[in-house]
Amino acid sequence: MRWSDAQEEKLISAIHPLLVRGWSSRAPLAAAFLAALAILSPASKAQTAATPASSNTAAPAHKHPAADPAPSAPVKTIGNHTAPITMEVFSDYQCPSCGNFYETTLRSMIQDYVASGKVYLVHHDFPLQMHNYSGQAARWANAAAMVGQFPEVDAALFDNQAKWTADGDLEKYVATGLSPANFKRVQAILKGCTGPAPTSKVDHTLPQPEAGCPVDPYIIQDIVLGTQVPVQATPTFVIHYKGQSYPASSGFITWPILKQFFDTLLSQ
């Protein structure tokens, strides 16, 4: 499917009140986009169509193998949402600086301050048009997030960035972070994702979701959010603490320096 002009207007209108307030809340802004997405989604109609008619006749009992739970909206977060500090990161999985930022800064932060409940990490996809595979990588991450495996695939993508950037075999390296059963679930979600993945455009036009690809709208909502921040380069991060939000910063920062900043906030 393609976004119509009316749909684009509804999406922007739904999030506009939050955007004009700026980054004034510590709560992740992705929730606003999920609400906006619901405006455009025919979910309620589909649910009605899928609801069986009531009957007074009891259906015969059958034993079936337990089915995999239906995938839900992707949760691309690590840590406890009640942590005093929230850090939102806009990232491109193929961006070398993003890979370096993850390996040398975010990994240590996750092991130390996220694990201890001090920081809540929120990932936003901002795949750049200049990278051949960044949009596809975002699809894998979102599909994994739909089945509760985001941290595992997030790490697998960054750990193997140089390899899949060279050979384009994302599937092989994503599999290293998942059990065989979870990998099959992720593959099933992406079954209809055969065309080009959405990426941020140089001219800032809104990318179009592929019909039959359930993860594309979530990537697009991150791109729209990043454009409004605005994201000028990847990685870009925004930090929230006690109702205060600190302006978006781009580029690389070491963990010791970031940790010192967090400690200063926590001491207030």
Language-model features, listed with the residues they occupy:
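Compositionally biased, proline/threonine/alanine/serine-rich low-complexity intrinsically disordered stretches
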Residues: 46-65
